[in-house]
């Protein structure tokens, strides 16, 4: 038997399986017709968001309002028949149906009339938003309680009085039986869902913001989402895997921004051992360099500043000690220069870095032995073990991190776009930077794929195995390493920022990627590395805030790269001048939406105050893109090809039809 015979047998087995799904010519032909019809529909709308940094309120609002698209749809339909105030009220109802209905029920005198008018408007909006999708796709999105009725109303054609009466009777019955409120909620959520076909989160769900957990809970309920991991995401993923350096870093950042409610209340991590340790060793230390960044209007956080400052310093020193064991174990990480505790002159209170002597602003190190500065005290060893245990055994954190692994990756190719959070490692001349991992050299696409697989091993492999240990070390490297695609800098100057006042020592030099990202030829080279055609592809990423207020454009390299970190995080909004970007990719092309500051969910509901958004057309297609032009379209074309071959097999009698 030769290779051709083997291939023919495999092929026949495949078609016998396909024949079970389509057992005769009629069914196979019908499916071909259906798939061909789908190919000609407009492509679904994709939304891209990045660098949310735990700011759940603006994130949830942007999802609910479709980055301003919901209101534009209302205006398209009702601009000639509704006042602006009515449009705002209708939009708010769609964004927050439960809360808005509670207000309406208290204020509206003739609620049945209001229900009838509102239901008719919502059905019209829903019909408009769902018109580019197949009935099958819309049907799958319908809430089970109202699936049949909504489908009837969406696809009703008013060709006569009887049809209109039928439609009106359905609406009246919904109101009469007391289900109007639930029906409005169902329609509002369906509209939200129809606006966004696919959501891309390009990294950093976590960081300093208060509630990344709400963001992940929201994404877990979302109909279609993918995530490209950010450096802060990887740090939390490493902590959940039990990486001691990641645990210390997470707690350092959490104490720095007084964001301990997330750690203690939401994830149930016991911080009492850290507080007890910090009070013992830093009771009389003002810890001035470690005073957390708290809001003036947060009295609870301000009351705890002294304790949190001490916890902040304690975990920071512990972090510096813990990093040595990985750096020593993995010389290929090339991070020896970040070992600084042994470079301190503890008597003089100085340190020499790159030939320059700096005076330390703090020389109180009660847990450091100058003769062996990286050695953990017995209490430190017990402390880090307790903290790691809490992270590894937090059910909610583990559930969230498993979701990040299931929906996430280091990069994604999707509909000719290349998505990644940070960068592709390059040197200053634009050459690809490589890294030796387990005796083999990796760069570019292979490097990102290797980091992806090693991270999964760090989380999922058996405790104590070499695979898990190496993967755990890589997870920390991805947070801080010079060839990490999630970091993008030559060093992380954490020690210098805490202990040296001279800001020259704080400089973290970016890698070549950020110096050269305005060059079209560099973007073309990266796209080719990932198997994409530069003439029709682009890079979409975040990580570095775009300083729009200084005139910086998010559109780089003649449109080959779009950077969408616009400052969801309040801490960066002074730099960016805006409060975030959404990139929208629909059948007409690309639109970049910049968002103004979001006050609060409460104000959005009570005052019907929406986020002000400005839309910039990045790319306008003369010919509307269809499903055929997408990745799903390519898959459907393969299915059509196979089904056509199955028809031929039936007609030749190779496989018998079942009628």
UniProtKB/Swiss-Prot annotation:
Cofactor(s), by name: Mn(2+)
UniProt KW Ligase keyword: no
EC category name: hydrolase
Catalytic activity from the UniProt record: beta-D-fructose 1,6-bisphosphate + H2O = beta-D-fructose 6-phosphate + phosphate
GO molecular function: fructose 1,6-bisphosphate 1-phosphatase activity
Key words, A-Z: Carbohydrate metabolism, Hydrolase, Manganese
EC number: 3.1.3.11
Pathway(s) it belongs to: Carbohydrate biosynthesis; gluconeogenesis
Keyword Transit peptide: no
GO biological process assignments: gluconeogenesis
Entry similarity comment: Belongs to the FBPase class 3 family.
Annotated protein name in UniProt: Fructose-1,6-bisphosphatase class 3
Organism name: Clostridium botulinum (strain Alaska E43 / Type E3)
Taxonomy of the source species: Bacteria, Bacillati, Bacillota, Clostridia, Eubacteriales
């Amino acid at each position: 038997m030769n290779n051709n015979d083997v291939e023919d047998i495999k092929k026949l087995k495949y078609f016998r399986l396909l024949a079970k799904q389509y057992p005769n010519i009629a069914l196979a032909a019908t499916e071909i017709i259906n798939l061909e019809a789908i190919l000609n529909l407009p492509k679904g709308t994709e939304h891209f968001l990045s660098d949310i940094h735990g700011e759940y309120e603006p994130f949830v609002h942007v999802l609910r309002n479709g980055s301003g698209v919901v209101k534009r749809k209302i205006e398209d339909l009702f601009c000639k028949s509704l006042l602006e105030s009515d449009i705002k009220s209708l939009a708010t109802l769609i964004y927050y149906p439960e809360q808005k209905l509670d207000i309406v029920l208290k204020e509206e005198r003739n609620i049945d009339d209001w229900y009838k008018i509102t239901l008719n408007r919502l059905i019209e909006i829903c019909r408009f938003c769902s018109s580019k999708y197949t009935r099958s796709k819309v049907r799958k999105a319908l809430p089970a309680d109202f699936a049949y009725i909504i489908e009837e109303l969406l696809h009703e054609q008013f060709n006569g009085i009887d049809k209109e009466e039928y439609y009106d009777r359905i609406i009246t019955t919904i109101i009469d039986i007391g289900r109007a409120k639930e029906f409005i909620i169902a329609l509002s959520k369906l509209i939200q869902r129809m606006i966004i076909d696919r959501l891309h989160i390009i990294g950093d769900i976590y960081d300093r913001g208060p509630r990344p957990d709400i963001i992940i809970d929201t994404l877990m309920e979302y109909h279609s989402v993918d995530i490209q991991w950010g450096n802060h995401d990887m740090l939390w993923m490493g902590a959940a895997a039990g990486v001691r350096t990641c645990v210390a870093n997470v707690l350092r950042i959490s104490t720095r921004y007084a964001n301990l409610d997330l750690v203690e209340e939401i994830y149930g991590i016991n911080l009492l051992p850290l507080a007890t340790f910090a009070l013992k060793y830093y009771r009389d230390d003002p810890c001035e360099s470690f005073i957390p960044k708290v809001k003036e209007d947060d009295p609870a956080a301000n009351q705890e500043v002294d304790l949190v400052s001490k916890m902040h310093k304690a975990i920071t020193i512990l972090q510096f000690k813990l990093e040595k064991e990985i750096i020593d174990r993995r010389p290929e990480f090339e991070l020896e220069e970040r070992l600084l505790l042994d470079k301190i002159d503890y008597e003089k209170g100085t340190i020499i870095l790159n030939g320059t002597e700096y005076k330390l602003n703090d020389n109180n190190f009660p847990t450091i032995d100058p003769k062996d500065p990286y050695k953990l005290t017995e209490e430190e060893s017990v402390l880090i073990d307790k903290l790691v245990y809490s992270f590894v055994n937090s059910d909610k954190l583990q559930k969230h991190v498993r979701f990040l692994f299931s929906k996430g990756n280091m990069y994604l190719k999707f509909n000719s776009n290349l998505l990644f959070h940070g960068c592709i490692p390059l040197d200053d001349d634009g050459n690809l930077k490589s890294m030796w991992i387990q005796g083999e050299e990796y760069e570019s696409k292979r490097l990102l794929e290797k980091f992806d697989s090693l991270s999964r091993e760090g989380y999922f492999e058996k405790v104590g195995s070499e695979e898990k240990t190496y993967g755990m070390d890589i997870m920390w490297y991805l947070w801080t390493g010079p060839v990490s695609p999630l970091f993008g800098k030559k060093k992380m100057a954490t020690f210098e920022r805490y202990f040296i006042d001279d800001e020259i020592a704080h400089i973290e030099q970016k890698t070549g990627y950020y110096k050269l990202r305005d060059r079209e030829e560099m973007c073309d080279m990266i796209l080719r590395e990932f198997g994409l055609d530069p003439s029709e592809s682009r890079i979409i990423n975040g990580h570095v805030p775009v300083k729009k207020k200084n005139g910086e454009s998010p559109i780089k390299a003649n449109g080959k790269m779009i950077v969408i970190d616009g400052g969801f995080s309040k801490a960066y909004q002074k730099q960016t001048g805006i409060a975030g970007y959404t990139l929208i990719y629909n059948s007409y092309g690309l639109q970049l939406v910049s968002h103004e500051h979001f006050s609060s969910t409460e104000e959005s509901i009570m005052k019907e105050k929406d986020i002000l958004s400005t839309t910039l057309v990045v790319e306008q297609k003369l010919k509307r893109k269809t499903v055929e032009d997408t990745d799903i379209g390519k898959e459907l074309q393969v299915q059509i090809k196979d089904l056509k071959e199955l028809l031929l097999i039936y007609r030749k009698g190779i496989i018998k039809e079942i009628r």
